[in-house]
Amino acid sequence: MSHLDPTLLVLLVLAALGIISHNMTVTLAMLLLLVIRITPLNHFFPWVEKYGLTIGVLILTVGVMAPIASGKITVQAVLNSFMNWKSLLAIVIGVLVSWLGSRGVSLMSNQPSTVAGLLVGTVLGVALFKGVPVGPLIAAGILSLLIGKS
């Protein structure tokens, strides 16, 4: 019997979770990683590991800002939002989340043993609860508060 790569098995299980939960994002991400792993493209993994998060945040930011850039949300509407208590609360929460994310990056860099749990938790949250895969950095930031590390 040939040796089965456990990493491939993990990617397949996570892709299956994506299919079962009808979460195309998880499914496509896992299948893309699977293709990269089993083809000569696997030599790009260091690049993906180094820049993937930055590229993902860039794409997410473009998607979030597109309505402003296209004019669908006007400058006046943006300015008016600062007069609303919900928008002001959103600003405060945005600052808090950014701070948590920075703590998360630090924790993930200094304690790589936490990364696997954070990633599995995030993928499960995305696959099973229709979450959005922006959680690892924030989750790591919250974890850093709970375990007292930065």
Swiss-Prot record:
Stored InterPro entries: UPF0756_TM
Record's subcellular location: Cell membrane
Membrane topology reported for the UniProt record: Multi-pass membrane protein
Keywords, alphabetical: Cell membrane, Membrane, Transmembrane, Transmembrane helix
Bilayer-spanning residue ranges: 8-28, 51-71, 88-108, 123-143
Top-level taxon of origin: Bacteria
Pfam families: DUF441 (PF04284)
GO cellular component terms attached to this protein's record: plasma membrane
Family: Belongs to the UPF0756 family.
Name recorded for this polypeptide: UPF0756 membrane protein plu2726
Organism the protein comes from: Photorhabdus laumondii subsp. laumondii (strain DSM 15139 / CIP 105565 / TT01) (Photorhabdus luminescens subsp. laumondii)
